[in-house]
């Protein structure tokens, strides 16, 4: 019999873990990006389909290799961003994702940080791909983006040239970009 104490996940986390929404790669994605953590092994790739005229996210999906909190955070993020402008999506915080899930145990905050990090990397990659930089997009990388880069560097040191998912579209692990 196990002596492990289960983490106090909310009913929403457990529901989205068992029945994730928008799971799977998106073949017609405008852009995608990945964020991962070698500390726990979690990886999230976010795919966005963008209405370029309206600058609005019309569809989002994800791939997740990780724990219940990782899958739930990516799933809820894809629901939250749909219908938002790119700028509105950029302003989403890891805390908002955690709150949408009914809270996460402190030891699992990094899961919502990874989801938001992948989102922000996808947004940056989108504008880099277009050769544009809107005035609201900060020059400096966010904490979530910096964490993703730190973790990718650690992966590279541990494993050499390494791509988490084997092929992101314009951003994420394994790319030569720094954001």
Which residue ranges define each predicted feature?
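Broad hydrophobic/π-residue packing in well-ordered secondary structure
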Residues: 8-10, 17, 45, 61-62, ...
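Structured beta-strand/loop patches that form or line metal/cofactor-binding pockets in enzymes
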Residues: 23-57
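Active-site- and interface-proximal helix/loop "cap" or "latch" segments in soluble metabolic
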Residues: 39, 49-113
């Amino acid at each position: 019999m196990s002596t492990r104490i289960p983490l106090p996940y909310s009913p929403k986390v457990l529901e989205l873990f068992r029945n994730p929404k928008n799971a799977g790669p998106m073949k017609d994605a405008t852009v995608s990006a990945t964020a991962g953590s070698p500390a726990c092994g979690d990886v999230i790739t976010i795919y966005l389909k963008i209405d370029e005229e309206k600058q609005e996210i019309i569809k989002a999906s994800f791939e997740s290799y990780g724990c219940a909190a990782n899958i739930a955070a990516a799933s809820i993020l894809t629901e939250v961003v749909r219908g938002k402008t790119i700028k509105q999506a950029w302003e989403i915080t890891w805390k908002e994702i955690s709150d949408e899930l009914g809270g996460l145990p402190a030891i699992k905050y990094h899961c919502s940080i990874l989801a938001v990090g992948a989102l922000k990397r996808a947004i940056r990659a989108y504008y880099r791909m277009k050769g544009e930089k809107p005035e609201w997009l900060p020059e400096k990388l966010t904490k979530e983006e910096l964490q993703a880069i730190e973790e990718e560097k650690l992966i590279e040191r541990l494993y050499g040239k390494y791509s988490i998912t084997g092929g992101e579209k314009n951003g994420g692990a394994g790319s030569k970009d720094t954001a």
